[in-house]
Amino acid sequence: GLPDAEDLPMCDEGWEMACQAAAERRVDDVHLLQTQRQLAQAGRWDGVYILSVMAGLETSVLVDADDQVFIDWGTAGQVTLQPPVGGRLPFKLWVHTHPRFAAYWSSTDTNSLALGSGILQTAMVLGQPGPKHSINRSMVEVNHSEFIREQGPLSQWTEEAPRYY
């Protein structure tokens, strides 16, 4: 099972079924999506990352103002977000994975952050050695001095080193 999962609302069997679905790339499997949602709600990003690595595919988790969780799966190198129907602005968090790769902001990611500057509070990319966070200072108060860019919309997003899982 998933380490330190005693407090999560899922059993070992549910985790194993989700892992099997991920390994078989059945990204619309109800057990996989339910487990991923539970992990996201619990802030267990290590579990979300493990499922992404097992599938060899990028995945995205979007959390809206009401804590609704929207999940998308993509290819090995990109995940396209579907419209979060019923979601409410602002979005609290956008998380996506770089399975088996470094946690960094790719050009696609920074384009997404720039476009989301008016509706997204925080973002995270899951990769190696752990999650890389960024906070949108135009929406959330931050005590931080480094930003992704010096000018333009990316000057609102903090530049932070990855942390360990």
Regions found by a protein language model. Give the residues of each.
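Conserved beta-strand-loop surface patch within small alpha/beta domains used
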Residues: 1-93, 100-165
